[in-house]
Amino acid sequence: RARQEGKLHRAAGSDYFIFPRSCFTDMPAFAIGRAGWDNWMIYSGRKNGWPVIDGTPSIQIIHQNHDYSHLPGGQPHYKLPETFENVRLAGGKRTIFELLDVNCRLENERLQPVPFSWKKFWREVEIFPLVRLHSYFLGQVFYSVFHPVKAYREFRQSIKRKN
């Protein structure tokens, strides 16, 4: 039934992680099940120089479809305080990584480098200050160069919040 009715989850969300216990001893106190914590796991792995592996091609994982009736107003959690707090704990919006940001894939029972694509190349350039130089400021600058309209909108929103 999963093969017939199921659909692949979008790359922004990751639900399963396998890692040595010693890797994430400094994990912030995230609200698990809300946005941000899974993205931080990918970011943290890349920042620490660890292999971050996408197992999607080799591992079939079933994620149950559900609604959000258990949340206030039955709305998705993306605009709820717990999600905003998760993003803050993660270090801000630039640390929200997704499957595009992994550096290996588990495919045909072998670890392989992520195949080359221009999208991946430019994303690696964009995140270079975050994962190699460990500079959030330069990460923000690079984000602004690659996404000027989004960066401008974020800037305008931050000014509105201050007023």
List the predicted regions and their residue ranges.
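C-terminal catalytic/acceptor-binding lobe
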Residues: 31-162
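Conserved catalytic core of nucleotide-sugar-dependent glycosyltransferases
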Residues: 1-43
